[in-house]
Design a protein with these regions (language model features):
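Phosphodiester-processing cores and adjacent nucleic acid-binding clamps
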Residues: 1-350
Length: 350
C-alpha cells in the first residue's frame, strides 16, 4: 500500500474495493518494514466484508545491533498475524526494528523471530528473500539451511513463495523473470525435500495495470533518479493486484499453490484492534491522607490547586478567577482526566 513509503502506490480504500470486485474474501497488508497502515486497513476491509490479514514485509539481518553497510537492507521476509497474539508479537518485532535495529531501514534479526514467532505465519518473500538470494548465488546448501531453520521455528506455518512477473521487456525479464524461473524451480525441489508447502503470490505495489507508469515515477522520486536514466531501478509493470484467473494463467501447473493461499486465509482469525484507552497507573505518595477510593482524584486536585495558585498568585482572591478555576476543575472531573493529568505531569515534570 501507500504506507510502503515512496514504494507502494496502492491506496487502501480503492485496494479493498478492487479486491472485493475480483471476488477475493481476504487480503493481506505487508508494507515494507512498518505497520503504519494496519488500523486503517483493518477497519476498511472489515467494513467492506473482506477479511483483513495484518502483516509486514520485514528486513532481516544477522544482528540488528550491528550497523554494517553490507547489511543495511537485509533479506525480505513476510510475516502475517494469524491471531491477536501474533499481531502483538509482530508489533513488538517491528517496534524493535526501529528502536534497536534501524540503520537506513528498520531491521530485525532471527533472535527476535525466535522470541516472538508465536501466532505468526511466515512466507519466504520475493527475490529479495533469504532463500531466493541463496539460490541466485548458487548456494543451494545455504538455501536448504535457511528453509530448515524457518521450518523448525514456524512448523506448518512456514510457506515458500513462487512469483512470476513476465513483462515482455527483454531487459526487465533478464533481471527479474529469468531469475524467478530459476528460483521457482529450486523452491519446488526444496518444498518436496523438506515437506514445506508453497504458495503463488504477486508482488503488489499498485492496484491496476494502468497504474504502472505512475508507480514508475514514484520509484524515481524514491531513488532520486531521472526517468530517462538507463541504469535506474525499474519494476516489471506486473506488480498490480491480479485476479484469480490471471494468477491461475501464470501458474497453470500449480493449482495447489493457489489453493494454499486460501489455507493461509483460513488460518487467520478475525480479531479486533479496538480497546479501552490504556493509561499508566501513577500511585500517589504513601503518606497522602485520603481514602483509597478518592486517592487519585484527590491527589490530582492537590496538584491542580498548587499549580493554579502559583500561576495566578495574588489574583487568586478575585471572585471571577475563583469561579473560572472551579469551572475548569468541574469539567476535568466530568471528563475523568485525572489519570491523563498524572501522565502529562510525569512527562513534563523536571
Amino acid at each position: 500500500t501507500q504506507y510502503s513509503i515512496l514504494d507502494g502506490a496502492a491506496a487502501i480504500k480503492p485496494l479493498i474495493k478492487r479486491a472485493k470486485a475480483l471476488g477475493m474474501n481476504a487480503i493481506a497488508i505487508t508494507a515494507h518494514g512498518n505497520m503504519y497502515g494496519v488500523k486503517n486497513f483493518h477497519d476498511t476491509a472489515t467494513e467492506a466484508g473482506v477479511k483483513p490479514i495484518l502483516g509486514c514485509e520485514v528486513y532481516v539481518v544477522k544482528n540488528r545491533f550491528e550497523k554494517d553497510k553490507d547489511e543495511k537492507a537485509g533479506d525480505h521476509l513476510i510475516l502475517l498475524a494469524k491471531n491477536l497474539e501474533g499481531y502483538h508479537n509482530l508489533c513488538k518485532m517491528v517496534s524493535y526494528s526501529f528502536t534497536e535495529g534501524f540503520y537506513y531501514k528498520p531491521r530485525i534479526d532471527k533472535q527476535l523471530i525466535e522470541q516472538y514467532h508465536e501466532g505468526l505465519i511466515c512466507c519466504s518473500a520475493c527475490l529479495g528473500g533469504e532463500v531466493p538470494q541463496a539460490i541466485m548465488h548458487n548456494d543451494i546448501e545455504e538455501a536448504e539451511r535457511v528453509v530448515q531453520w524457518f521450518k523448525n521455528i514456524f512448523g506448518e506455518d512456514y510457506y515458500l513463495e513462487l512469483q512470476l512477473h513476465p513483462s515482455g521487456d527483454p531487459q526487465k525479464d533478464a533481471d527479474v523473470y529469468e531469475n524467478q524461473l530459476r528460483v521457482n524451480k529450486v523452491i519446488l525441489e526444496l518444498a518436496a525435500k523438506y515437506g514445506v508447502k508453497y504458495i503463488c503470490s504477486n508482488d503488489v505495489h499498485f492496484i491496476l495495470a494502468e497504474d504502472a507508469v505512475a508507480h514508475d515515477h514514484l520509484i524515481c522520486l524514491n531513488t532520486g533518479r531521472d526517468l530517462d536514466d538507463p541504469n535506474r531501478m525499474r519494476y516489471t509493470f506486473q506488480e498490480y493486484l491480479k485476479s484469480p484467473e490471471e494468477m491461475a494463467a501464470l501458474f497453470p501447473d500449480h493449482p495447489e499453490a493457489l489453493a494454499t493461499t486460501l489455507e493461509i486465509a483460513d488460518k487467520c482469525e478475525d480479531y479486533k484492534l479496538t480497546h479501552a484507552p490504556l493509561m499508566p497507573n501513577f500511585p500517589p505518595p504513601e503518606d497522602f491522607p485520603i481514602a483509597l477510593g478518592e486517592l487519585r482524584e484527590s491527589f490530582v486536585k492537590k496538584i491542580e490547586d498548587e499549580e493554579m495558585l502559583a500561576k495566578i498568585g495574588a489574583c487568586a482572591t478575585v471572585p471571577e478567577l475563583e469561579e473560572l478555576v472551579a469551572g475548569d476543575k468541574e469539567l476535568s472531573d466530568r471528563l475523568m482526566v485525572a489519570k491523563q493529568y498524572c501522565y502529562l505531569k510525569d512527562l513534563t515534570y523536571k
